[in-house]
Amino acid sequence: MAHKKGQGSTQNNRDSIGRRLGVKKFGGEFVRAGNIIIRQRGTATHAGSNVGLGKDHTIFALIDGFVKFERKDKNRKKVSVYPAA
């Protein structure tokens, strides 16, 4: 005999909140040192020139400059920051 009567639909109605991941500064945008460029899980995009990689794989600017997305090789992306000339 069931101990709970017909309440399966209410038990299954939960969802986790979004983690606010993704690109925060896009290509060509000006960034200041310390600005977050990408929040990600794992290194989907790798760190290029003048950017740092946080322990949670967040990519952030180390200098003031412009964001540039590039290809590292055939199937890897990287992001760099180049100073304003």
From Swiss-Prot:
Matching InterPro entries: Ribosomal_bL27 (IPR001684), Ribosomal_bL27_CS (IPR018261)
Under the cellular component aspect of Gene Ontology, which terms does the record hold?
cytosolic large ribosomal subunit
Which Gene Ontology MF annotations are present? structural constituent of ribosome
Keywords linked to the UniProt accession: Ribonucleoprotein, Ribosomal protein
Q: Which GO terms describe its biological process?
A: translation
Q: Could you say which protein family the record assigns here? A: Belongs to the bacterial ribosomal protein bL27 family.
- The entry's protein name is Large ribosomal subunit protein bL27
Organism equals Campylobacter curvus (strain 525.92)
At the highest ranks, the source species' classification is: Bacteria, Pseudomonadati, Campylobacterota, Epsilonproteobacteria, Campylobacterales
